[in-house]
Amino acid sequence: MAGSAGEQTISGYIQHHLTNASVGEGFWTFHVDTLAWSVVLGLVFILSFRAVAKKASAGVPGKWQACVELIVEFVDDTVKSTYHGKSALIAPLALTIFVWVLLMNLMDLIPVDFLPTAAALIAGESMDVIAAGQSHTYMKVVPTTDVNMTFALSLGVFALMIFYSVKIKGFGGFMKELYAHPFNTPWLYWFNFILELVSLIAKPLSLSLRLFGNLYAGELIFILIAGTLGVWQLPIHFLWAAFHLLVIPLQAFIFMMLTIVYLSLASEEH
């Protein structure tokens, strides 16, 4: 029975940390924490990069300016080598995606109890209630562990894919790609259409689920470490955080890179 109680306690701890602060019901449920943190991190990106742009000097750059210039040059070189269209929107879009997703992913490195506990205290709950696991204040601080956020990002990319395909190839050219490829034979048009439609829909699905799955798994492991090891969690927590430092920028890069590739394919003229 003691083991069962322990499992329930750990299960409740995990469930609490993986539950979003929400308003509304059903389809119209809004995850307030995801929306708030994504907006805050977006503003951090915009304001910090804007501050660097305003203070940029031709002389020896400061550390933050050098960091920003390194990121901008890296993204610009990636776009130039991958995107073969003529749109001037792609490089700023790629930079926004990379930095914004990176900042959201970096929230995974904050100790799992820190911000939820602070939110519960601000909401008026006592430390005794929080320590007993009876807090009713929920907060997920990593927006990319919310599948709604990753789907929203991928749907934006999907909309741009359709936009560039129709803009460059025309609606007729876009539809012809769906039914006349890969087999340009009239009696196989129906098969082509199904095949290409599945392939088209799979792109935003895989884009969103890849980011969500990797970050959700990482957050779950952090929570398991915190919930099962107590005071002994710190060494393992830091070891996992060190490993996760590779995953966090890698997933941001993959999301950006696939976005560029998809938009490049959409912009090709046939």
Curated annotation (Swiss-Prot):
Subcellular location(s) of the protein: Cell inner membrane
Membrane-spanning segments: 27-47, 90-110, 147-166, 182-202, 211-231, 238-258
Pfam family, one: ATP-synt_A
Role according to the record: Key component of the proton channel; it plays a direct role in the translocation of protons across the membrane.
Family, as annotated: Belongs to the ATPase A chain family.
Subunit field text: F-type ATPases have 2 components, CF(1) - the catalytic core - and CF(0) - the membrane proton channel. CF(1) has five subunits: alpha(3), beta(3), gamma(1), delta(1), epsilon(1). CF(0) has three main subunits: a(1), b(2) and c(9-12). The alpha and beta chains form an alternating ring which encloses part of the gamma chain. CF(1) is attached to CF(0) by a central stalk formed by the gamma and epsilon chains, while a peripheral stalk is formed by the delta and b chains.
UniProt protein name: ATP synthase subunit a
